[in-house]
Amino acid sequence: MTASLPPEVQQVFNSFLTTEFTTVDSRGRPICWPLTPYYDQGDPCIDVTTALGYPKKAEDARANPKVSLLFSDPTGSGMDDAPQVLVQGTADVDAQDLEANRKRYTREALVKLPGSKDLLPPKPLQRLFSFYFTRLYIHVRPERTSSMRASKSCGSRVGSPPGQTYTRSGRTWM
């Protein structure tokens, strides 16, 4: 579905440094986590990660794959007038090759957050922090995507033009 979205929405997925990732826990309560999204234009999914040492996000997404991503804060994205984008989708937790996930995370994080390079421990010591660098990837396949522009005054949407909603053909998310 992402390839059929407007380029500006795809740019939000690629450029934003954080997204609010929401899962539903075993008691039916929503839990929201700020995570860094990883996306390449045209990919079928938007990916987020969690450290192997902090698996709750992945466990909740595995138990109830209906998740959402809210792209609301463009800070650091270089997009001054970015729309806010809500993605409701289906999660797939990738824990098949943890070593490949660790390498991918290290590579992608340095591209997305180049300033983090100075904060990384030296490579030989990174193994001591495997609980953090070893990653579970959560692939979110959008089922419904909505975008709207926030008003400049206090973030209020009062008086803002209606947003756009895109739904994968023949699918319901609820």
Language model feature labels by segment:
Residues 16-53, 59, 69-72, 83:
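Short beta-strand segments
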Residues 60-67, 107, 111:
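Short, intrinsically disordered, mixed-charge
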Residues 78-174:
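Charged, gly/pro-rich active-site loop segments
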Residues 1-20:
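Short, basic/aromatic recognition patches
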Residues 41, 52, 73, 93-95, ...:
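Non-catalytic surface loops within mature trypsin-like serine protease
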Residues 14-16, 30, 133, 140:
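Short, surface-exposed loop/turn motifs at beta-strand boundaries within globular domains
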Residues 51-55, 65-75, 114-126:
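Short acidic (Asp/Glu) patches
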Residues 43-45, 66, 90, 144:
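Structural motif
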